[in-house]
């Protein structure tokens, strides 16, 4: 047996809270053109409108679901075995890959043979790694440029549409007022898309498989989907699709274990993490990553230079191209879907950071800057970029070109070092695209609000619309402990301007490693930012969920308000702090205004009065005002009265 029984029983589990379905929700699957294209969504059941408000049916709404099999009661979850290989059949059917006899990374072979790591290795089903056949290119971009719509692309189109058309049809058939209800619930404000696809206010605009293929072929979107991570559910990152969010996890030299990191991953995807980056820098990086990938239904990203540095005992100057290359192959054969590679940190840019307030704050950037200065040579990442592309396209690993010179304070925002690196990333993007390798560009950082759009505009210009992936940006530096908020502001703005994926920031940013509660707080904050950006862009159907919650709020359907929201648990908890009884869940008021001052209750009273008098709501309001005016004069025409 190659796994310690104590580890398996004590740590290798999924927290029960991470696998329970969310309240009034169930996992549903939408089948595509072939039986094995089964796209997961979360169906949220709603109560009927109370009789006093019309008594109409409220059909379920459907929302994007990143939780994988974990919230499916029918799934058998055993993280010691890993998840089912969802894409295995699609990969094999293309006939352009080969299964290797074993690992081809020297370090991977050493770890597999090391008895000291036997107790920590993933014990589940082991597949030999897969690689492109000689002369073949297995990237989704390559297929797209050949005019091929892959099952992954069809899966994504279904997923992005979130059954909007079916929801509108169910509204139309809900009763005599169905057509009116469908028009109301499907309405959304026109967006301002800043050059992205102009969907207008059309909630029913459909994302087609052909649209997905075209965006991938143009380089405006990526599908991170390593052929060695068949467990992943296909997703897309691009500004003409729903804004995505990434959650960072990972151990350090001083804290965390494999079990904790798997737990954080499942927790992050429960609350909406579209991808997860494993930024481990402590012990057992290789083993930790294997456990995470085998159990992850979302793409996994890494920063390979972190592990390469561990291999040279933390001495940046001892890094070599050969060590880094072996690390890329090691991680690609495990199934990492995208690599952050800081190839834009060039020797000529390092002196430009000398006058900064906060210097170089990127770990990867500082590692490469130190190497360049120690050898007074150009970065080996930049020099060997074409060779890196050859590795990427053999496994379909996507580039996340790292912003190693991003500003670490608003003082340093948009300076010469940051923008010089961005130009280089644009040049590297063109090289990667020659190889049909998928690329996204990482962005800042710390940027005040008035400079955010300039960042987005320059990235679109210099990087030819490759997807932008930003950390925030943080819009002020005065709030340690609240940087999920300072960055959420910037994230919403830059998402609106065109960023495709937002890297979450937790309350622990700059202070320490996040725990599970911090992960959830960061995820929810960034789901809000991403959704606000979708609304502002006018993305098809973005307002459906808002409309459903607003209707539930107006009709005092408290449980539906909780359940449609991003965090039903917190909403219910806050409500119950002041109105804990079950009777309060059907009351026509909350603790904010009480029973006599609820604006929505007053509106309902006006409507009832209008119906009783046989007049319009406007006439009812006018009559009510006339009655109150007479009453005011009779009581002395004084604004205030002593009781």
Swiss-Prot record:
Keywords: 4Fe-4S, Iron, Iron-sulfur, Lyase, Metal-binding, S-adenosyl-L-methionine, Thiamine biosynthesis, Zinc. Substrate binds at residues 248, 277, 306, 342, 362-364, 403-406, 442, 469. Binds 1 [4Fe-4S] cluster per subunit. The cluster is coordinated with 3 cysteines and an exchangeable S-adenosyl-L-methionine. InterPro entries: ThiC, ThiC-associated_dom, ThiC/Bza_core_dom, ThiC/BzaA/B. Pfam families: ThiC-associated, ThiC_Rad_SAM. Its cofactor is [4Fe-4S] cluster. Zn(2+) binds at residues 446, 510. GO terms for molecular function: 4 iron, 4 sulfur cluster binding; carbon-carbon lyase activity; zinc ion binding. GO terms for biological process: thiamine biosynthetic process; thiamine diphosphate biosynthetic process. Its EC number is 4.1.99.17. It catalyses: 5-amino-1-(5-phospho-beta-D-ribosyl)imidazole + S-adenosyl-L-methionine = 4-amino-2-methyl-5-(phosphooxymethyl)pyrimidine + CO + 5'-deoxyadenosine + formate + L-methionine + 3 H(+). [4Fe-4S] cluster binds at residues 590, 593, 598. Catalyzes the synthesis of the hydroxymethylpyrimidine phosphate (HMP-P) moiety of thiamine from aminoimidazole ribotide (AIR) in a radical S-adenosyl-L-methionine (SAM)-dependent reaction. PANTHER family: PHOSPHOMETHYLPYRIMIDINE SYNTHASE, CHLOROPLASTIC, THIAMINE BIOSYNTHESIS PROTEIN THIC. Homodimer. This is Phosphomethylpyrimidine synthase. It comes from Burkholderia ambifaria (strain ATCC BAA-244 / DSM 16087 / CCUG 44356 / LMG 19182 / AMMD) (Burkholderia cepacia (strain AMMD)). The lineage of its organism: Bacteria, Pseudomonadati, Pseudomonadota, Betaproteobacteria, Burkholderiales.
């Amino acid at each position: 047996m190659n796994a310690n029984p104590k580890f398996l029983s004590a740590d290798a589990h999924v927290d029960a809270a991470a696998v329970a379905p969310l309240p009034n929700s169930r996992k549903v699957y939408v089948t595509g053109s072939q039986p094995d294209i089964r796209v997961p969504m979360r169906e949220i059941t709603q109560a009927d409108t109370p009789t006093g408000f019309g008594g109409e049916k409220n059909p379920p709404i459907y929302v994007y679901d990143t939780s994988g099999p974990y919230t499916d009661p029918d799934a058998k979850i055993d993280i010691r075995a890993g998840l089912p290989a969802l894409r295995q059949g699609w990969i094999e059917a293309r006939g352009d890959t080969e299964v290797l006899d074993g690992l081809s990374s020297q370090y991977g072979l050493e770890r597999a043979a090391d008895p000291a790591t036997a107790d920590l290795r993933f014990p589940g089903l082991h597949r030999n790694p897969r690689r492109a056949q000689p002369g073949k290119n297995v990237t989704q971009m390559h297929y797209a440029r050949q005019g091929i719509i892959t099952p992954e692309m069809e899966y994504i189109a279904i997923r992005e549409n979130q059954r909007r058309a079916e929801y509108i049809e169910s509204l139309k058939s809900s009763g005599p007022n169905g057509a009116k209800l469908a028009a109301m619930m499907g309405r959304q404000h026109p967006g301002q898309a800043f050059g992205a696809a102009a969907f207008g206010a059309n909630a029913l605009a459909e994302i087609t498989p052909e649209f997905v293929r075209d965006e991938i072929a143009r380089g405006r979107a990526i599908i991170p989907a390593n052929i060695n991570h068949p467990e992943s559910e296909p997703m897309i990152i691009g500004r003409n699709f729903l804004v995505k969010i990434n959650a960072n996890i990972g151990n350090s030299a001083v804290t965390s274990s494999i079990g904790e990191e798997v737990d954080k991953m499942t927790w992050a995807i429960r609350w909406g993490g579209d991808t997860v980056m494993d930024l481990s820098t402590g012990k057992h990086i290789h083993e930790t990553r294997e456990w995470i990938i085998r159990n992850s239904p979302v793409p996994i990203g890494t920063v390979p230079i972190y592990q390469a540095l561990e291999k040279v005992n933390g001495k940046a100057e001892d890094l070599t191209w050969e060590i880094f290359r072996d690390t890329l192959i090691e991680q690609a054969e495990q199934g990492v879907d995208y690599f952050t590679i800081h190839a834009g940190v060039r020797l000529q840019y390092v002196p430009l950071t000398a006058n900064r307030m906060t210097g170089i704050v990127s770990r990867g950037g500082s590692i490469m800057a130190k190497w360049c200065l120690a050898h007074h040579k150009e970065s080996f990442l930049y020099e060997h970029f074409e060779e890196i592309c050859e590795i990427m396209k053999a496994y379909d690993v996507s580039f996340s070109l790292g912003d190693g010179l991003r500003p670490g304070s608003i003082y340093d925002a948009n300076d010469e070092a940051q923008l010089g690196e961005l130009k280089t990333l644009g040049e590297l993007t063109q090289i990667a695209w020659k190889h049909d390798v998928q690329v996204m560009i990482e962005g800042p950082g710390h940027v005040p609000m008035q400079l955010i759009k300039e960042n987005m505009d320059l990235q679109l210009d210099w990087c030819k619309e490759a997807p932008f992936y930003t950390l925030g940006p943080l819009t002020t530096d005065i709030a340690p402990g609240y940087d999920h908020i300072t960055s959420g502001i910037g994230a919403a703005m830059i998402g609106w301007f065109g960023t495709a994926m937002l890297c979450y920031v937790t309350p622990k940013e700059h202070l320490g490693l996040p725990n599970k509660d911090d992960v959830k707080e960061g995820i929810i904050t960034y789901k809000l930012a991403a959704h606000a950006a979708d609304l502002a862009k006018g993305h098809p159907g973005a307002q459906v969920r808002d409309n459903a919650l607003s209707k539930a709020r107006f009709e005092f359907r408290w449980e539906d308000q909780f359940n449609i929201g991003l965090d039903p648990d917190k909403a219910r908890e806050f409500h119950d702090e002041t109105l804990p009884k079950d009777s309060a869940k059907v009351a026509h008021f909350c603790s904010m205004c009480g029973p006599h001052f609820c604006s929505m209750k007053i509106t309902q009273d006006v409507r009832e009065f209008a119906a009783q008098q046989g007049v319009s709501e406007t006439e009812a309001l006018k009559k009510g005002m006339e009655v109150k005016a007479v009453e005011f004069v009779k009581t002395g025409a004084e604004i205030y009265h002593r009781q």
